[in-house]
Amino acid sequence: DGLMLRMSEAQWDAVINVNLKSAFNFIHACAPIMLRQRGGSIINMSSVVGVHGNAGQCNYSASKAGMIGLAKSIAQELGPKGVRANAVAPGFIETPMTAQLSEDIRKDWMKKIPLRRGGQTNDIANVCLFLASDMSSYVSGQVIQVDGGMNM
């Protein structure tokens, strides 16, 4: 993370490579199998900052926005062969990383969330389970924000 004007190209590349290029490589390897079986579900893990941006996180935001564009493009390319692609965009999720935030910062975040709580990792997992299942057989090219209503 860092301000764009202070970010080196190496810092930019590191985040883009981990978050976006690795997803492309994984999908590129798996898609032929899904095409042969005429079905499958690709789920890209994005973020609400991929939808809305965030000052000080231009590389992360761009990589997560790229995950959305990748899912939408793949949904169009592979959909005719029965392969679905979607993106999940988590908001504030209770993790060891967010547990390190100060109480004041946490309170500020909770004020922005209508449900007045952070999400749990199983909230994300349940959305992914839905997208991977036949219950979502007509859902493709979508971004599902799992954020307690923070970004309506």
Please give the residue ranges for each predicted region.
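Active-site loop immediately N-terminal to the catalytic Tyr-X3-Lys motif
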Residues: 3-5, 52-58, 80-81, 116, ...
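Substrate-binding pocket helix/loop in short-chain dehydrogenase/reductase
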Residues: 2-4, 8-16, 98, 109
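C-terminal helical subdomain
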Residues: 87, 110-135, 139, 148
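Alpha-helical segment proximal to the catalytic Tyr-Lys
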Residues: 32, 76-80, 137
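Residue(s) in the substrate-gating loop at a strand-loop-helix junction
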Residues: 47
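Active-site helix of classical SDR
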Residues: 27, 63, 71
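Active-site loop-to-helix junction immediately N-terminal to the catalytic Tyr of the SDR YXXXK motif
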Residues: 7, 53-61, 73, 101
